[in-house]
Amino acid sequence: MTVLEDRIAMAEDSGELTLDAMFEWLEKMPVPEGYKVEIVGGNIFMSPQRRTHWQIIFNILDQLRARYARQRLMSDVRIDFPGHLNGFAADVAALAEGFEPDDRGRLRYQDVEFIAEVISKDTATNDYEPKLAAYAAAEVPAYLIVDPYTGKWHLHTLPKDGEYRGHQSLDFGYEIDLTGTVVGLVLKTDEFPRD
């Protein structure tokens, strides 16, 4: 698909929409500043970045620096995941040492060791359902959902056969023990703000 001045025309012989075409189209749209855009299951979602949201993201990134070099940490960068048209821009992604972009210069889901998503009210279902399934299918070793509305975090580990076998949920204030995963450290949550 290619984007023209006033319409979208299908350019591929198959007539099927692709993630590349959808993101190309989005790049030409007037997305409001401060909004995150993702494609989940072929649907486009835009959500505002709130102060609380960013504080939690920054806190996690800051703690991950004890184990990961800066260039191995990403936030809001497109990574395509298994499933139908899943182009996610995770709040936090930690990549394996020696990761290499693909031939198009994009990050590969196979290099992701850790994902954290800080939920937004309007897109929370994505983090708890389709993204959970996609990250498990991609065998991301550790997927953390942080919910500033309930003051809880949910850690999913041990991906196998498209689902996570390990799950732990606790309140803010309790540490997130990732020592049994490739991440190999403990995250503190006592400074996570609530919405």
PLM-predicted stretches and their roles:
Residues 1-195:
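Gly/Pro/Ser/Thr-rich low-complexity, intrinsically disordered segments predominantly at protein N-termini
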